[in-house]
Amino acid sequence: MDQKGASGSRPNRLSQGKEAYACERSATVSVAANRNNIINEMAKICEADRQTSAIARRTQVHERLAVANSDFVAVEDLILAYAEPTPEDQVEMIMRDFCSSPTYEEDEDEPSFESEPWFRFRNKRIRTYSRKRDPRSYMAVRTEKPRGTSGLSVQRDLNTSFTSMACDFDAASSQKIHEVLLNLSQYFSATAKTSSPTPVPSQIDLPTEARQDSGKECFNAEVENLRDDLLQNGFTFEASIYDNEHEQEGSEKFNVCSDAEIAEHKKLLKGPTQAEHVGKEENPNFILEGIPLSEWLTPMEPPMISKDVIKNIPDKKVKLEPSFQKEQKSSKDSNESKIRAPSKPSCDITEKNEGTTVLDQPYAAQQENLSNDGDLLEEFLFNEWHPMQCSNGPSTSNDAIQVPKEEINSIKRTDEEQPEKETPNKSRSTSSHQLSFRKTSLKFIEISEEMKIKGEKFVDKVISGLYHPSHKCNLRTEEYSDNHSQVMESTQCVEFKSALNKPIELLDKKETYDMLAKVEVGEINGKCSPLNNEAIAEPEFCGFRTASNKAIPISEKMKIKTAEFMAEFQYKETNHQNDYLVNQPNDNSTSVGLDTVLKKSIEISEEMPTKASKLVVVDTRLGEPHQPTLDPVCSDLNEPQFFGFRTASKKAIEITEAMEKRGAMFLAQSRATDQQAEWQPSDFPDIPHTSPKNEIHSINVENNKAVHTKTASETEFFGFRTASNKGIVISENTKMKVAQFMSEFQAADASTDSNKPIVISEEPSNIAAKFVDEAAAEDSPSKSTFCNVQSQENPLNIEHFKHDLFVKRSAKEEHPLCSQPLVRTPRRSLEIHSSLSQLAGQSPLDQATKKSVIARRNLLSLKRKRKIVSSTETSTSCASPDMERFAPKPSSTSTPLADRDLNRSKDCAKNRQDAEDMSPICMQPKKSRRLGLSRSRY
């Protein structure tokens, strides 16, 4: 019965819906008519455009009629009407000169309705790179008699004519020719008034009078574009306007109705009550008369009709009640069904009155396409709606979830079966929960027997790890036994919970009870017992700890390594003290020993002095060291220890006899230089000490002060030094080479400056002899003493050293105030070397000559470098040994320059540049000739 009633009520509801829709539609149309009727105005504009396009199509023919009031006659018409019997070629030539446009060519197959680009660019032809039309049809006309052209030019003809298709003209346009044409046309028109009563239709229009009505030529395609723009901006045309409409002449795709037709269609929709709102009919020509064409292209914003309609129309609730009483009874019996949005209160179903609910509700975007809620709910009865069934999982929203009764009963049964349990907390709070494991979706997990066994093992491990008996628990055993019984009586059940506050079942309950009782007894005793205030004596750990304050166990190997390191460190400290005390007078005997950082003595075995004797020189004046006490850390050391130098990987370096000899010689040199500075403390604390073979040597240096002060004041250290101002040992081979070089240098100086002879005195020769003897004693390994050494060198070398030392002494006497004495630069001749002058008559491309020049140049540069180095080092060594590291270094280039002194004003002149300062590569073309050599060729 319900289905029959529903089928019978459906056509009634459809008719009611259509009537309601028609009423609402008429209301919206009336409101739109009250707001100046914008859509009708746009329709009038379209109708005016259609009429103008039809007029333009009628007037667009090849023969254009002239204005009735004008007396203008075209030259072309006069020529054709009153033509004398002349040859046709002359007529075509005149027509080509006066009646054609050179720049404008009109296509024959150009469509009559072409409208793009719009308006003022419509008659402009856009040049593209497409294939041009083959002008073979014009070739015969253009090439008949090109010599017969008159050379006249006119302005561009904007009007089309059939003569322009067959005429050619120049590209230049002139205003004078235009005025000539005007005069000619007026002359012929004045003379033709009497002869021809009816003027001949002209086909030539002047540019000033042409295209005045071009704005009215709106074609059908432009109207279509305007319609598309209106549709895009939100305007819609009513379907009733286009129903049963006959196409007029000139319209191709659609027609726009007039105002009378629109009013008739509105009367059908509005009824007799809405007829008074129809506006007066107006002629579209009068409407568009004062509107310029440029304003038609301005974008127009769509009217805000929907908002006004929403404000005026009130909300109306639609009650979807069935028409039969049976349906009313069934709807009363059923529960109230409402549509519930997520996390929002329920809302009744309201009617969509022109978008009111769409704008008011926040979820309107989902209901845009719904025209009417009644249309959607027509196929469903109100009593057939059922609430949605929710799943068992938890929901994130605040909506109510309907749970079936079966699940509620099952949950109640499980709660009744599980007994309530209490946990003995401090607050004694009890809570009843279901004991089981659950997933996140509130589903139970089945626990197998293997999982139970693993859980029991894990609980045992946790309990064994938590319970550790300490000293405090042993002291409180009596109190624990008294309180344990009380706690066990009070506790009934123990319950653990997970992170999500879910209960966890316990397997071994007795062990957990015991553990909790012990923990609580410890807390109670900690608060009440007086033993808490007393400090319990626990053994303190003295040693190293980690970052987490954990003790680091120290093994025996680590102790042995630390003992070795402390012994080496203490030996270095004692060596430094002994080295400092050697150079100072010590009246009182002091005890020297090895101590650790905590001032504990270190035991010295029998092997230690023998190894230390290779590196340490002990002064005889120092008192005997006292016997140190035994250190408990080093008492177990029985392994031999290595004292000496080690590599980066802590490997021992064996010291040979040659190294010991070199160390002894170096120590003697450093001690001799230190004695010159008024017996100040040694500046070389890091110098290794000599072997026990040279003990007598160092002792003699300390005991014989008076003997050495005389010699040290007269002698000075001669040699090279390192960057740390330490002397470098000079071997005999180097001395021989230096002697030969000095002899060559002195011979060169004697040849260049022969006017000033060299005078050698006796005193500096004796000093030089002593210095050479001392230097020779340094190199001889067989000699043990430093002072009493006899020279066995070549006398020639000695003479060279004497001369060099005399030059330094004389320089110091001449310039006592200068810290660095000046060295005179020897004069050289301005002539080029003989080996270089050979290139004048040979080609620069000769390979043999190139090789010889390069070899000679390198040799000269090396010799000049040696002279510069020797002069700077000898001069600076006389002044002070510390200035050696800051001495000027020669340049490392292959192009040598002359050694000049910057302190002299003559040498510092920028403009002065002699040929002797130039190498064969750097010589300028003004001063000397170029040899044609460059570094890029070899």
From Swiss-Prot:
Involved in and required for double-strand break repair by meiotic and mitotic homologous recombination. During meiosis, has a dual role in the repair of meiotic double-stranded breaks and the efficient activation of the meiotic recombination checkpoint. It is found in: Nucleus. BRCA2 repeats lie at residues 537-571, 638-672, 713-747. Keywords: Cell cycle, Cell division, DNA damage, DNA repair, Meiosis, Mitosis, Nucleus, Repeat. InterPro entries: BRCA2 (IPR015525), BRCA2_repeat (IPR002093). This is Breast cancer type 2 susceptibility protein homolog. One of its GO terms (cellular component) is nucleus. Interacts with Rad9 and spn-A/Rad51. Residues 926-938 have a biased composition (Basic residues). Residues 320-359, 409-434, 870-938 are annotated as: Disordered. Residues 870-879 have a biased composition (Polar residues). It comes from Drosophila sechellia. GO terms for biological process: cell division; DNA synthesis involved in double-strand break repair via homologous recombination; meiotic DNA repair synthesis involved in reciprocal meiotic recombination; meiotic recombination checkpoint signaling; regulation of DNA-templated transcription; response to camptothecin. It comes from the Eukaryota. Residues 320-339, 409-425, 898-915 have a biased composition (Basic and acidic residues). Its main location: nucleus.
